[in-house]
C-alpha cells in the first residue's frame, strides 16, 4: 500500500504560499479591471501550478539571501580549524559510500559526517551548525544536485580537499535532461579539490577524468 509523507508547513513554505495567493488575487484584479470579468481569474485557478511555479521563482533570491548568514556561520565553523574535508557526490550510492568511508576513518580520527541524506545547501549548513565542533579532525560532506551550479555553490564554502564521484547514471533526467548535464553538474565537485577519487568502472566518468589529470591527483577505483 502506497503512503504519502506528511508535508511540514515550514516558514519558507508559508511565505511561498502567501506569494502564490497574492499572485492569484493580482491576476483576478487585473482581469476585472481590464474588462475580462472573471475569465482570467478562472484561468488562474485552472493553471494554479503555473502560478505557484512563478511564486517559487519570485521567492528564490529572497530565500537565498535570507539564508546567507546561516550558510556563512556553517562555513566559518567548518573552515576555522583547517581540517581535511572530503566531498562526495554521484548519481547513486553517495550515502553508502559516505557511511563506509566514515566507519573506516573513524577508527583513527574524530570524523564529522553529514547525517542521513542531508546533501543540499541548507541541509549541509544545518548539519554543520548543529553537529560540528572543534574536536572533529576530519569532515565528510555528501552533496546532491538537481541543476548545474548547485554543487559549485556548496563547494565555494565547504571547500573540499578530496572529492569523490561514485558514478553517473540517468537519475533526475526530468530536471537534468541529459547524462552530459548530470556529468557536468557532478564534476563541479572537483574544481577546488586537490585530489579526486572516481568510479573506475564508469566509462563516461573515466573519459571526463582525463581532463583533470594535469591539475589534480586522480585515482580510479574499479572492481574489474
List each language-model region with its residue ranges.
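Short, basic phosphate-binding NTP loop
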Residues: 1-86
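Short, well-ordered alpha-helix to beta-strand connector turns
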Residues: 82-83, 108, 136, 193, ...
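AAA+/P-loop NTPase substrate/partner-engagement loops
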Residues: 117-131
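Inter-motif core of Ras-like GTPase G domains
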Residues: 151-170
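Short catalytic-loop micro-motif centered on adjacent basic/acidic residues
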Residues: 87, 112-114, 138-142, 196-198
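Switch II (G3) loop of P-loop NTPases
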Residues: 136-151
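Acidic, Mg2+-coordinating active-site environments of NTP-dependent enzymes
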Residues: 165-224
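Walker A (P-loop) phosphate-binding motif
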Residues: 73-119
Amino acid at each position: 500500500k502506497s503512503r504519502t509523507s506528511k508535508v511540514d508547513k515550514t516558514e519558507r513554505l508559508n511565505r511561498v504560499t502567501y506569494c502564490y495567493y497574492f499572485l492569484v488575487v493580482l491576476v483576478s484584479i487585473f482581469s476585472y479591471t481590464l474588462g475580462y470579468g472573471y475569465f482570467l481569474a478562472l484561468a488562474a485557478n485552472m493553471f494554479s501550478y503555473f502560478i505557484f511555479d512563478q511564486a517559487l521563482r519570485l521567492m528564490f533570491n529572497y530565500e537565498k539571501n535570507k539564508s546567507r548568514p546561516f550558510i556563512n556561520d556553517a562555513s566559518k565553523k567548518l573552515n576555522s580549524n583547517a581540517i581535511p574535508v572530503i566531498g562526495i557526490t554521484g548519481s547513486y550510492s553517495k550515502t553508502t559510500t559516505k557511511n563506509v568511508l566514515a566507519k573506516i576513518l573513524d577508527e583513527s580520527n574524530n570524523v564529522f559526517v553529514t547525517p542521513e541524506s542531508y546533501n543540499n545547501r541548507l541541509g549541509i549548513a544545518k548539519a554543520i551548525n548543529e553537529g560540528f565542533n572543534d574536536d572533529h579532525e576530519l569532515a565528510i560532506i555528501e552533496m546532491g544536485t538537481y541543476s548545474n551550479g548547485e554543487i559549485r555553490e556548496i563547494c565555494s564554502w565547504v571547500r573540499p580537499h578530496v572529492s569523490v564521484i561514485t558514478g553517473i547514471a540517468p537519475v533526475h533526467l526530468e530536471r537534468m535532461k541529459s547524462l552530459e548535464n548530470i556529468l557536468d553538474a557532478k564534476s563541479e565537485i572537483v574544481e577546488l579539490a586537490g585530489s579526486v577519487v572516481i568510479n573506475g568502472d564508469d566509462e563516461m566518468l573515466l573519459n571526463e577524468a582525463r581532463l583533470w589529470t594535469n591539475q589534480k591527483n586522480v585515482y580510479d577505483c574499479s572492481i574489474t
